[in-house]
Amino acid sequence: MNKDFFNFESNNFKENISKEQLDSDEIEMNKIIDEYIQHPDCQSYIANFKTIKQICEEVLKQRRPEIKEIEWSRNIGINDAIKYAHQFLTTIDSTLADQFMNLVYQNNNNQKTLNIQQKYIKPYCEKGKAYIEYRSDIKSMITLLHEMIHAMGYSDAMHTNSEDRCLSESPTLIIENLFSKWLVENKIITQNDYNLLKEWRLRDSQDLASKTLMEIALVDMRKKDQYITKKRVLEMIDEKQHINNFATREECIYYLMKVLNNKELYFKESERYIIGQYISDKIDKSRNPEKEFLEIYHLTINPNIKSEEYLKIIKGKYQEPNIDR
């Protein structure tokens, strides 16, 4: 695959071109996008792109906090992390707090719910089992609760319908923010620590939002029967640079080369974090964020709700000018 996909001399600068005028990489990119458009598992996602596009643009407009120090103010061991998470959950829902502690120390047939790894891994939760590397820092403490919220909400029925879990990262991103604020209020971490956590999460969410907007634009081109060409892709990137915190041109090109080389789009996974970031920001401004968290949490562990219903809820509750209730 040509690594210099966008460093080119091309004749494809005409608006109306035929398939015969495309080079091999352009043909491949069009093929990748067409396969996603036609795939049954992707059609409900693509049908909701208008809503997802608006959410992406809102996430990109969120302001990153000011960081005064780039180091954490303290170390936090895993036992303290578990203790603080339990104390915090008690302020939201005692049943949830009890479930957290039961699962943390659950060890049935050597199958632990919380699995601490000794080497670096990207934290994840699989079939109700949480896997993290604990580094005794504040970020690890937040990550531990994030993955345990996934584990606590797991069910076999939900796993079976995992493709429809577009809100699956919403309770975890909400809980990250609420837990971080509680830690500041109880003088366990500093305001700068909170800002570091918020900046880390928002930066990742905005990166995913930029990439998802690019994927949506590629799908839109093909749905309009336009061939994806290098010129059109570069124009698309340049047109979106006015959006706050949109990725740089170089980052966009690097990402689209990844799509081309891997023959894969990533919007299905990315939109979970983007929606979570969007809802977390809205709930942060509400009168009772703890109640809002519980509503979202119980909604996401319901295996019978589909993506379309989730997005209707988002439109009704969180795309209003004012959710101060």
Residue map of PLM features:
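Active-site-proximal, well-structured secondary-structure segments within enzyme catalytic domains
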Residues: N2, F8-E133
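C-terminal, non-catalytic "cap/extension" segments appended to globular domains
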Residues: N12, N16-D25, N30-I46, T51, ...
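Secondary-structure transition/capping motifs at alpha-helix termini
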Residues: T91-F100, A151, S155-N161, K181-N192, ...
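Short pre-active-site segment immediately N-terminal to the catalytic Zn-binding motif
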Residues: K127-L144, H159
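Catalytic glutamate of the conserved HExxH
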Residues: T143, E147, A151, S155, ...
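Post-HExxH zinc-binding segment in Zn-dependent metallohydrolases
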Residues: A157, S162-D204
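Short glycine/serine- and small hydrophobic-enriched flexible loop segments
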Residues: I174-K181, E185, I216-V219, Y278-K285
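Long, amphipathic alpha-helical stalk/connector segments used for oligomerization, subunit docking
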Residues: V184-N261
